[in-house]
Every structure is written in structure tokens, then in C-alpha cells.
Amino acid sequence: MPTINQLIKKPRKSQKEKTASPALQNCPQRRGICTRVMTVTPKKPNSALRKVARVRLSNGFEVTAYIPGIGHNLQEHSVVLIRGGRVKDLPGVRYHIIRGAKDTLGVNNRKQGRSKYGTKKPKA
């Protein structure tokens, strides 16, 4: 426990708040170019082939982003828009690709939760 005099000489440092998505640099989304599209396997109790992409962002960061939904059209050099949001069972994946923006198409035959997957309203 420091004395009052010690605190006058050297005050306490306020703790910096850590951000969950540092590559966005306080922006809601960032544009990037896919450098690699691949599948990865999740952590222990789960089993699947999750679709992810390595993305070089417009600010120079290179991040791994998850591709949500069933099926996608992404390949190398596709331009994508990413947002924050981690995938709990994929270590190191802290970003999501936004479906229906830039080169990413929306999910086909999606009826519910369409706004999250960039799908247009079906014709009645």
C-alpha cells in the first residue's frame, strides 16, 4: 500500500480498456480482400468444418473472419466487408464477414433471419 507522498510523486495509472476487435480501430466495419479461403475444425466438444477466410484489411491488418450461413461464393481476391464478433469454438476468429455486401452474396433460400444473411425478401 503506497503512502500519500508516494502517490503524489507517482499517481496511479488508469487501466486501459481492451477492445474485442482491435483491427477495426473503432470503426463499425472494415473493407478487406480475401487472401485465403479455407475450412477449420472447432474446439473440443464440437465437430464440423467451419468456413473462414483470411482477410487483408484496408488499414493493413490481416485477420481471420468467419463466413456465416450455408454456402458461399468467396474466393481469393474477393472484396468483403467485415464486422466484429467472435466465433466461440474457433480460436483466433474474432470477426464476421457481412453477407450481401461487396463481393459476398446472400444466402440462397433463406426465409427467416434474412437481414443477417443478406437475403432479399422472396416474391409473394
UniProtKB/Swiss-Prot annotation:
One of its GO terms (cellular component) is small ribosomal subunit. Residues 1-24 are annotated as: Disordered. It holds the Pfam family Ribosom_S12_S23. One of its GO terms (molecular function) is rRNA binding. Keywords: Methylation, Ribonucleoprotein, Ribosomal protein, RNA-binding, rRNA-binding, tRNA-binding. One of its GO terms (biological process) is translation. PROSITE patterns: RIBOSOMAL_S12. Gene3D superfamilies: Nucleic acid-binding proteins. SUPFAM superfamilies: Nucleic acid-binding proteins. It comes from the Bacteria. The modification 3-methylthioaspartic acid is found at D89. The keyword Ribosomal protein applies. InterPro entries: NA-bd_OB-fold, Ribosomal_uS12, Ribosomal_uS12_bac. CDD domains: Ribosomal_S12. Part of the 30S ribosomal subunit. Contacts proteins S8 and S17. May interact with IF1 in the 30S initiation complex. With S4 and S5 plays an important role in translational accuracy. Belongs to the universal ribosomal protein uS12 family. This is Small ribosomal subunit protein uS12. It comes from Borrelia hermsii (strain HS1 / DAH). The gene is rpsL.
